[in-house]
């Protein structure tokens, strides 16, 4: 039997995180919710009924002069108007900032986003969000709200495919990594060392950690986000061994030195920490970047789409399969494969596995 870890986001759910506001001058400001600040937990933030603060990307930021913004409501929707959704800039940092949202009617913020927001489809699609994206840009098993991008390798998994996987004796498990807007950012620098990775929070249950620790079969990751989640676990374990507690995984931590701990020791340290503190799941974040030279410790097989040039995802593929990535991509280009979010998929085996 093999263990198949579903999409790293396997049960993360894309939220309609893009909101359009308007100043009294008529200027349009787009606000893209990234992660909750106050309250800091996703579930609590989505349950807020009057106000909450989020870290956001702010489009047309130079036009926002710190005044309160009113939601743009071109269709004069009465339900939307009754909410009275407003945005106030609390802190500015270039094109990002902390925004406080306030509204009436006692709706939870999750409902506010459903009624007022749009699904943030990838910018490289070069089109506006369509109603069908609400359904299609979501995995069948999406459950936990928090992502601003879908784990698109999982879009290929219909119920028939999932049933077929189970029928073949392949175990399916859930991890959850909330995909951030950084997944869209190309590598602009000639040196990847200058490319900043954004923090992405992830959750793995105690039971799953035990099963991964004891697993003796090939480990299959559906999606590059699953790879980042699973490979980050090793370094979270290292922090538990050396510092006594789990810490976020820094971008270049895997390359700082040769780590001698076994996977079993590393995951065992996380398990011991959770059990000692009465916790049933690990909640932490990662900025891990996977480039050629990375030592894979958990993932053997990868299901993934075809990615755009000059992206960190191409670097991950190169690290995973070695120089064969060029042959794979040449074949895809020569045979008319579709790339990116709504494109075709591939099954890749780690070099040396």
Each predicted region: which residue ranges?
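Surface-exposed, charge/polar-rich loops and edge strands
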Residues: 2, 6-353
């Amino acid at each position: 039997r093999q263990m198949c870890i579903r999409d790293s986001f396997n049960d993360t759910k894309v939220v309609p995180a893009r909101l359009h506001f308007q100043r009294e001058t008529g200027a349009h400001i787009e606000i893209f919710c990234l992660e909750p600040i106050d309250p800091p937990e996703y579930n609590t933030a989505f349950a807020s009924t009057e106000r909450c603060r989020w870290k956001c990307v702010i489009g047309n930021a130079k036009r926002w002069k710190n005044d309160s913004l009113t939601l743009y409501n071109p269709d004069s929707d009465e339900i939307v108007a009754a909410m009275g959704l407003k945005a106030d800039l609390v802190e500015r940092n270039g094109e990002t900032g902390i925004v406080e949202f306030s509204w009436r009617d006692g709706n939870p913020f999750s409902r506010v986003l459903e009624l007022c927001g749009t699904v943030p489809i990838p910018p490289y699609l070069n089109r506006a969000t369509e109603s069908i994206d609400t359904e299609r840009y979501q995995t069948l098993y999406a459950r936990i709200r928090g992502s601003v991008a879908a784990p698109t390798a999982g879009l290929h998994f219909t119920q028939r495919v999932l049933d077929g996987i189970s029928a073949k004796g392949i175990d399916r498990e859930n991890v959850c990594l909330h995909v951030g807007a950084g997944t869209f950012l190309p590598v602009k620098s000639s040196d990847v060392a200058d490319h900043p990775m954004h923090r992405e929070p992830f959750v793995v249950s105690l039971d799953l950690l035990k099963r991964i620790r004891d697993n003796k079969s090939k480990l299959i990751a559906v999606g590059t986000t699953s790879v980042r989640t699973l490979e980050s676990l090793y370094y979270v374990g290292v922090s538990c061994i050396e510092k006594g507690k789990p810490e976020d995984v820094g971008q270049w931590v895997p390359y700082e030195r040769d780590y001698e701990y076994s996977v079993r020791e590393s995951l065992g340290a996380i398990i011991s920490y959770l059990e000692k503190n009465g916790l049933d799941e690990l909640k932490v974040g990662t900025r891990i970047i996977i480039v050629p030279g990375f030592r894979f410790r958990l993932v053997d097989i990868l299901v993934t789409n075809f990615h755009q040039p000059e992206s960190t995802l191409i670097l991950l593929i190169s690290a995973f399969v070695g120089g064969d990535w060029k042959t794979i991509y040449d074949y895809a280009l020569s045979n008319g494969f579709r790339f990116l979010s709504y494109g075709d998929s591939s099954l890749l085996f780690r070099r040396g596995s």
